[in-house]
Amino acid sequence: HAKDVVFGGEARARMVEGVNILANA
């Protein structure tokens, strides 16, 4: 789970941003 520690925050933020864009479309 080292990758989750390194990339988790940024990847999760990007994914949430993408979901919000789709939800607002």
Swiss-Prot record:
Signal peptide: none annotated. Its EC number is 5.6.1.7. It catalyses: ATP + H2O + a folded polypeptide = ADP + phosphate + an unfolded polypeptide. It is found in: Cytoplasm. One of its GO terms (cellular component) is cytoplasm. Keywords: ATP-binding, Chaperone, Cytoplasm, Isomerase, Nucleotide-binding. Disulfide bonds: none annotated. GO terms for molecular function: ATP binding; isomerase activity. Belongs to the chaperonin (HSP60) family. Forms a cylinder of 14 subunits composed of two heptameric rings stacked back-to-back. Interacts with the co-chaperonin GroES. This is Chaperonin GroEL. It comes from Delftia acidovorans. The gene is groEL.
